[in-house]
Amino acid sequence: MNKPVSISRTYPRLAVYSQENFRGLRRVYRGNLGIADIDAVLTGIESLRFFSTNPNATLVLFDRSRFRDNFFILRGNRSIRELDDILRRGDVESLIATNQRLTAAQVRRIQRTGNLPPGYRLI
């Protein structure tokens, strides 16, 4: 008699690549997290894929490290071929990926304090 199998998946799933167009080295992260310095991961992230079953999942891109300065909020699944083309004023230097809907006020609080909400991993 076969036993039922239970599979648990953690969202969101963030796949980051060291080169544009989803090439080069790849690393996959799961769960709510913040990457404080993109250059410290794979010697720089050039493209990414963000996936969640929640349409309100949020990806926040910052143009300075440690979640500072200007930010851009994206909702839902995203495939970004060239990360540095997203922000008009500069390169993406840090990001937050979460399965929750982050409001602009919550992002400004993170920006002001430099601290992620409870339960988030800091990379």
State where each predicted segment sits.
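Compact beta-sheet-dominated domain cores in extracellular/mature segments
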Residues: 1-123
